[in-house]
Amino acid sequence: MIYDIVFLFVFYFILINYMYKVISFGHRCSSASFIQNLNLKTESYPFDWLVSKLDIIKDCIETRFVHFLNVNNYIIQNTESFNMTDNVKTHICNEIAQVNIYYETDIQNIQSIQTYHYKLAINHHNLNNDNDYQYYQRCINRLYELFETDIQKYYLYFHPIMGINDFQNNKENILNEFDNFNQYIIEKTKNIFGIYFILIKHNENIKSIKLKESQKYNIFVLYCNDNFVDGGGPFMGNHYIEKEEVLSILKNIFI
C-alpha cells in the first residue's frame, strides 16, 4: 500500500514537471486559478495574477518585457472591477491597480476605471516593491527558459465575459485574435497548444460547446447563468456548474 502511494506520488511529480507545462495567458486570474485547482501549477509565469490582453502578451514576449518592467510606465489607479454583458453592468469590487500607460494608446482608456478593460494592469503586486519586481524577473526568465525546451506546453486564456449579442457582433474579430496570437506563439517555441474559453452570459440547455478544434488550439464557449460573475479566482457568484464544466474540459486535455 505504501509503495503504491509512493509510486503514484513519483509518477505524478514526473508527469507535471517533465511531461508538460501549462502557462496562464490571462485575461485575468481565472486561468492561473484553474491551473492551480488541477494541481498543475508548479511554478509562476508573468501573466498569472494580473490583467493582460493577447496583443500585449505578444509585445512583451517580443520586447523581452522591457515595457512591462519599466516602472515609469505605470500609474496608480482606483479602479472598479465589473462585468458588462449586453450593456448590463454587474459590480464586483473596487481595487487599486498599477496600470501600464505605455500600452494605453487611447486617452479615454487611461481614464477608464474598469479594471478588466485595461491592456495591462497589476492588481495583486507592486512593481515598486523590490520583492515583487524580482518576482516578475524570475517569472519572465522562467518563461523564456521554458520556450527553449522541447517539452509539451499548453497555454490557457479566458476572454472577458460578454452577452450573447456582444458575442454575435464580435465573434469574427475574437476568432481572428485567437488565431493571430496562436500563429505568433508557435513561432516562438516548439510543442505548444492553445486553449481558449469564451464566456457568454446566456442560459442554454448545454453547458459548453467546442467552437473550433485544430492541431494548434481549441476554442470553447462556456455558457454562464444570470448570477454568474467573471471575477475572483476562478469565478464568483453562482459559478459552480460553470467551474466544474471548465475543469472537466481541462482534465480531458491534460490528464
Predicted regions and their residues:
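Hydrophobic alpha-helical signal peptides and transmembrane signal-/tail-anchor segments
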Residues: 1-17
